[in-house]
């Protein structure tokens, strides 16, 4: 590991494409077994830093280590220590969920591929859908399967590049629960996102990347301290759309029974 004990450490990372500077002197450090959210709008450089840390792209300047290995001098060791999940689930839709996992385990030359597949299916609540073709899975199920596949071989570090892009609210919550479980099992997670609520829900630490630079880095509590105290006035709280959605759907949305136990909104006739 690095001297600081960090699972991921980057110092002075710079990257330009032609005359456009994408990353400008980026520093970051991620402790072992934590979730670190890199927050920023499209084009901020989030995917570029992930590519550099996962050895897919060389920086123009700076140094980085992942799981104790330098990404420039020991790229093979870095790749053995990580898993990368991109913005869209990289699963074979023709195969079943279990077949996808078994295939990945065999590609990684892991023993007991079938048992590992069954364990991961149970861990990510996919056992009932194990033999179904992935083409029939919902977006949330596909993403959970994708994350499960990334755990084969027990990599200590996982990069999740905008893992909930294109998912509906219920599917996003399913993925959030899976990500929280990863950290609970000791896996280090670097998560990129442009969703503020996602970073707030998941991250132990949050860094904001803007125009290629880290402009703030800290815990949620530390970031809140950057703002002046809010003036408190009594306002009757109205439920948000998210409150309504979660109250109606809850966990029942996973099996298609959403709303069976929820109160229905009154019709115009009932209102009269």
What are these regions (language model features)?
Residues 62-73, 77-78:
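Conserved ABC transporter NBD signature motif
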Residues 83, 102, 106-129:
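Conserved ABC ATPase "signature" region
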Residues 158-162:
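Catalytic Walker B motif of ABC-type/P-loop ATPase nucleotide-binding domains
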Residues 217-218:
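ABC ATPase "signature
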């Amino acid at each position: 590991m690095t001297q600081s004990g960090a699972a991921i450490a980057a110092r002075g990372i710079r990257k330009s494409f032609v005359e456009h500077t994408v990353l400008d002197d980026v520093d970051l450090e991620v402790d072992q077994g934590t979730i670190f959210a890199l927050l920023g709008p499209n084009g901020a450089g989030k995917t570029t830093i992930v590519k550099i840390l996962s050895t897919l792209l060389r920086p123009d300047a700076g140094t980085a280590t992942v799981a104790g290995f330098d990404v420039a001098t020991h790229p093979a060791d870095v790749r053995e220590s990580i898993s990368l999940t991109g913005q869209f689930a990289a699963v074979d839709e023709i195969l079943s969920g279990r077949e996808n996992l078994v295939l990945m385990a065999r590609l990684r030359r892991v023993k007991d591929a079938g048992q590992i597949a069954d364990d991961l299916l149970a861990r990510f609540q996919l056992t009932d859908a194990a033999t179904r073709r992935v083409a029939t899975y919902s977006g949330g199920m596909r993403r959970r399967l994708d994350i499960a596949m990334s755990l084969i071989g027990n990599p200590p570090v996982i990069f999740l590049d905008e893992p909930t892009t294109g998912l509906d609210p219920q599917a996003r919550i399913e993925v959030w629960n899976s990500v929280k479980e990863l950290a609970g099992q000791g896996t280090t997670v670097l998560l990129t996102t442009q969703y503020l609520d996602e970073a707030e829900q998941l991250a132990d630490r949050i860094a904001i990347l803007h125009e290629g630079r880290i402009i703030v880095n800290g815990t949620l509590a530390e970031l809140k301290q950057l703002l002046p105290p809010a003036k408190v006035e009594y306002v009757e709280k109205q439920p948000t759309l998210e409150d309504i959605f979660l109250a109606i759907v809850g966990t029942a949305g996973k099996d298609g029974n959403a709303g069976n136990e929820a109160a229905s909104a009154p019709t115009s006739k009932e209102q009269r």
